[in-house]
Amino acid sequence: MRHMQSVTRATSICGSGVKQVIGKGHPHARVVGARKARIPEREELSVKPKMVRNTHLNLQPQERQAFYRLLENEQIQEFLSMDSCLRISDKYLIAMVLAYFKRAGLYTSEYTTMNFFVALYLANDMEEDEEDYKYEIFPWALGDSWRELFPQFLRLRDDFWAKMNYRAVVSRRCCDEVMSKDPTHWAWLRDRPIHHSGAMRGYLRNEDDFSPRGPGLTPASCTLCHKAGVCDSGGVSHNNSSSPEQEIFHYTNREWSQELLMLSPELLLDPECTHDLHILQEPLVGLEPDGTALEWHHL
């Protein structure tokens, strides 16, 4: 009995000694058999192969022909002719509509005017900096009651977007692929004029240009297109005069230089003379501290 007590006591002392030794060991010592904590996220990323996204649409001939028949719809034809400046329906935006139809998996029987306007609105959402021009789509898609119905239209847009798995970004290469199938079709000749590229500063806008007009009304007059001699949706000039004042506006997108400064006919300069261009900086404050007017300064 005494022997058993001594053995038990010795075992407990030995065990406590082992614990003390382990507890006081080197702080960086690794216990035998211990494994490093696994990081599942890193392991999954290292094992998962790189995904190469295929941008090829693989459009079938019957899909292209169904889309071209849709473009010949009377309502869509009137809408496209209304967009004389090609701000909301140039060739790239129309190509995006066809790409959206393919990504959404629409049957050719679903190539309808409503789906066209929904997809075109989404394309403008994705690509255009000017947000207000696309509102012209509302009265064409919804009719006279568009102010009450446009929230439902926006829900249709969201549903269409979800049907594409939210893949609304279409590269220029993809658009060029769509247009390359039938490069002579009239829809792919709708080049937007160079003077309508980019965004416009807010204080230069005419608010009347942004109010939706809808069917039955003539498009708003565009000063830039009038100066450039562009009068139809194809961007072709109907002005046959060859005055120097008008010839400066007859550049195509490929011929236009980013360093070219476009002036109105009233400001044309003599090409045989040398001119110095001075840019004036507008003063931030109207008066000096003593009450005298500030002068403009050359930059």
Swiss-Prot record:
Q: Where in the cell is it found?
A: Nucleus
Q: Which Pfam families match?
A: Spy1 (PF11357)
Q: Could you confirm whether the keyword Translocase appears in this record?
A: no
Which processes are annotated in GO (biological process)? Answer: G2/MI transition of meiotic cell cycle; mRNA processing; oocyte maturation; positive regulation of cyclin-dependent protein serine/threonine kinase activity; positive regulation of MAPK cascade; positive regulation of meiotic cell cycle
- Key words of the record: Cell cycle, Developmental protein, Meiosis, mRNA processing, Nucleus
What this chain does, per the entry, is described as: Stimulates oocyte maturation by promoting meiotic G2/M progression in resting oocytes, via activation of the MAPK cascade and cdc2-cyclin B. Also activates the kinase activity of cdk2; this activation does not appear necessary for oocyte maturation. Necessary for polyadenylation in oocytes.
Q: Which family does it belong to?
A: Belongs to the Speedy/Ringo family.
Q: What is known of its domains?
A: The C-terminus is required for CDK2-activation, but not CDK2-binding.
Q: Identify this protein by name.
A: Speedy protein 1-A
